[in-house]
């Protein structure tokens, strides 16, 4: 299966109509699609448009409640706990990070945890929200258990991504990564591309290395065992315990401080996922002149980029640089969408009674795709 490119405007229009068909208001739809398409613009297709089918399934199953509103259930001048009431993760998370930013502007720091939410997209979107306010930001989330702890054979932690962003010149520092070798979304992309997984990514239900994406994904959903390795693989000598430990840090800032559902129990309930998040905003002014701190940081980032390159390497990137370049390229030349994802979007249009050809006129669906349900 290959890819087809679409303009940002085409995908933006389509996503907005899909989320309104899901039952969200136009304002809510605009916010959700902005999170998803930002991921696609950054080159993180695993957390972009392809997630819409999963959200539709959540709404149909009753684990995502489109009408739910987040509620502050505990609060201090520097902190808050929010109950998302099983609403849409993107909407809850924007609300939570805005709360953290508000507190940071008043006190120097704002820390907000969330329980009873859903998948929120890329963590970096929320961390980067702080940069527009001149603040340092952090965001993290737990998820359905996919990470097998070091020396284990059963998934007990989520992908548990952690993102950090801070203003700098000429563009912000922006670091966002899962604490697993890869995310579940990456396995889903390999499944759609019908390619075997690279060695060192996943384990089967018996704890043995596996390159079979459909089997690993099925075992994760059915809780049969196996899953994705922590950053560093599955041995201490390669640093497995470090990825496992970073995953636990994320769990602390999301499910533990919020008194929410830990990853090993997420997505085991009939009417909720139980996913939890953590957000932090810090005002550099709490440490001195914020402009001087920004210059100091920017100079260091420039020194990193200009440091000696390894043989055969032309460039050293700082975190966030590739995303800036990807967004510029994709806004100009279009966003690639996998053919099997296009099939899923056509299926979705069939369910929602939307005219697929209205948005993607001239595209010929690969009817031999294993993802085609015939609902189009």
Residue ranges and their predicted role:
Residues 79-169, 177-178:
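A generic, well-ordered mixed alpha/beta core segment in the N-terminal half of proteins
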Residues 73-83, 94-110, 210-232:
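Residues forming anionic-ligand binding surfaces in small-molecule and nucleic-acid pockets
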Residues 1-8, 13-32, 37-38, 45-66, ...:
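Acidic, glycine/proline-rich low-complexity segments that act as flexible tails and inter-domain linkers
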Residues 196-266:
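Secondary-shell segments that build the walls of catalytic and ion/ligand-binding clefts
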Residues 147-221:
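Phosphate/diphosphate-binding glycine-rich loops and adjacent basic-rich segments that engage nucleotide
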Residues 2-14, 252, 257, 262-376:
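Catalytic-core signal marking the mid-to-C-terminal active-site face
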Residues 47-101:
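Active-site cofactor/substrate anionic-group-binding motifs, chiefly glycine-
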